[in-house]
């Protein structure tokens, strides 16, 4: 297996009216939606994942609102502009609650190519706590210095919240939405999925540890910093995330027989 562009994560060729790069991105994003459902991280038809298309137009792909994640295919993904307006005809509309978040981050950061927003129970529980994520587990340490926190202002429907979300994220790749959920923002679909998996594991371990008696064994600050730097390097400089994503797609398809 090579990369997500020609391995299990995509189909090798698509309809003639699609540019090959766009079709590869559509396939990767559709597989990501199916994976999020497979992992049990969905909230029925809610939440959203976006992938920015190549070029300077800041157009991106996102899920049609009303479809289950398992019903999403490469062809029924919406193509929208930075304000959430459809740029291609579709019988579906998007979720207005997603446009402010995704549009703001895609417009502000050219290094961001995929954003996954969800609120699993462990993640929502952790971001409800005043101190948010700790960094004392194997997974939590990998997130040290990589999380921006954003104060809950209600459902993200309004453009006036955009600059504050951008400021809260800064140069980081994880936006913890206090009392709400999480948005991970990375340079590819595979990288974003791997980062979300790490965040989810950190939240699960933190919740489990918090339910046990006794004090935590805190990790020294230099170890937390080292773990975060190592993980960032693996995501940035290697095919680590692609290998993980492709393997998870193969596992999902082997166990569920999913396709489109």
Task: State the predicted function of each range.
Residues 2-32, 173-260:
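A conserved C-terminal secondary-structure "cap"
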Residues 15, 23-116, 123-134, 140:
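An anion-binding catalytic pocket shared by soluble metabolic enzymes
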Residues 18, 89-92, 148-155:
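Short histidine-centered catalytic/ligand-binding loop motif
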Residues 51, 105, 119, 165, ...:
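Divalent metal-coordination and catalytic microenvironments
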Residues 102, 123, 162-166, 189, ...:
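A general structural signal for well-ordered alpha-helical packing
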Residues 107-110, 131, 167-170, 197-201:
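Short, intrinsically disordered, mixed-charge
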Residues 121-163:
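Class I SAM-dependent methyltransferase SAM-binding "motif I" and its flanking Rossmann-like core
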Residues 148-184:
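A contiguous binding-surface segment within folded domains or other stable secondary-structure elements
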């Amino acid at each position: 297996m090579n990369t997500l562009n020609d391995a299990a994560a995509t189909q090798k060729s698509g309809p003639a009216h699609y540019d090959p790069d766009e079709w590869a991105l559509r396939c990767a994003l559709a597989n990501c939606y199916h994976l999020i459902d497979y992992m049990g991280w969905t909230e029925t038809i809610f939440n959203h994942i976006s992938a920015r298309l190549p070029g300077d137009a800041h157009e991106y792909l996102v899920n049609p609102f009303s479809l289950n994640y398992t019903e999403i295919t490469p062809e029924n993904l919406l193509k929208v502009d930075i304000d959430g307006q459809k740029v291609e005809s579709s019988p579906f509309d998007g979720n207005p609650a997603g446009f402010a978040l995704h549009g703001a981050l895609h417009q502000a950061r050219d290094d961001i190519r995929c954003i996954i927003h969800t609120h699993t129970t462990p993640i929502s529980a952790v971001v409800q706590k005043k101190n948010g994520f700790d960094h004392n587990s194997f997974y939590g340490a990998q997130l040290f210095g990589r999380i921006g926190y954003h104060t809950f202002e209600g459902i993200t429907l309004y453009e006036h919240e955009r600059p504050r979300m951008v400021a809260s994220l800064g140069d980081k790749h994880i936006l913890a939405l206090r009392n709400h959920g999480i948005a991970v923002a990375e340079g590819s679909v595979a990288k974003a999925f791997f980062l979300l998996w790490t965040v989810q594991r950190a939240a699960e371990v933190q919740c489990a540890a918090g339910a046990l008696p006794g004090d935590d064994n805190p990790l020294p600050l230099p170890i937390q910093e080292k773990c975060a730097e190592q993980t960032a390097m693996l995501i940035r400089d290697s095919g680590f995330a692609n290998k993980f994503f492709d393997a998870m797609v193969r596992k999902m398809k082997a166990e569920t027989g999913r396709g489109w």
